Design a protein with these regions (language model features):
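Hydrophobic/aromatic beta-strand elements that line small-molecule binding cavities or substrate pockets
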Residues: 7-9, 41-44, 67-72, 91-100
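Intrinsic-disorder/low-complexity, polar/charged segments enriched in Ser/Thr/Lys/Arg/Asp/Glu/Gln
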Residues: 2-6, 54-56, 105-107
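Hydrophobic ligand-binding cavity/cleft-lining segments
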Residues: 1-49
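Beta-strand elements of well-folded, non-transmembrane domains
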Residues: 13, 61-65, 112-116
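Beta-strand/loop substructures that line and gate deep hydrophobic ligand-binding cavities in soluble
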Residues: 82-132
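Short, surface-exposed loop and linker segments with low hydrophobicity and enrichment for Pro/Ser/Thr
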Residues: 14, 18, 51, 97-105
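Short solvent-exposed loop/turn micro-motifs enriched in small/polar/acidic residues
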Residues: 2, 34, 63-65, 89-91
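Glycine-rich portal/gate segments that line the openings of hydrophobic small-molecule binding cavities
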Residues: 43-87
Length: 132
């Protein structure tokens, strides 16, 4: 996997870690409310494995495009989305990780990785990654 994009955002000081986590979990369960061009998300499975919650989802985009992914929620810490390669897209991962370098100073780091050479990047897929 090759890192495609990474950025970090600072969270306003009035937002607590619990509130931030609740927002990240909501985004994992209902990404269609947050990602432009995503039309729906169906939760197919949910299991607890080694202390992390694993979700199986099917997400749909315009034009009838659908894909299945896996989401790993590590309570209060991170959300990782794993997409297996399909006919028209590469395998990829998307990590949202809470960082707190000092008490009350919250950040979320976003890391996008894909199994594709840089010259093969699909502009539409890249735009969706940057919006997530």
């Amino acid at each position: 996997m090759r890192k495609v994009h990474e950025h970090i955002i600072q969270i306003p000081p009035f937002v607590t870690r619990d509130q931030l986590w609740n927002g990240l979990e909501k985004a994992a369960r209902h990404p269609d409310r947050f990602v432009e061009h995503m039309e729906g998300c169906e939760l197919l499975s949910e299991r607890l494995i080694e202390g992390a919650r694993h979700l199986g989802r099917e997400v749909s985009f315009g034009g009838g495009f659908r894909l299945r992914d896996k989401v790993i929620l590590r309570e209060g810490e991170s959300v990782t989305t794993v997409v297996e390669a399909g006919e028209s897209w590469p395998a990829s991962t998307f990590l949202m990780k809470i960082e707190e370098p000092e008490a009350g100073s919250l950040f979320v780091r976003f890391i996008y990785e894909a199994d594709e050479p840089e010259e093969a990047l699909n502009p539409m897929i890249e735009q969706l990654r940057r919006q997530a």
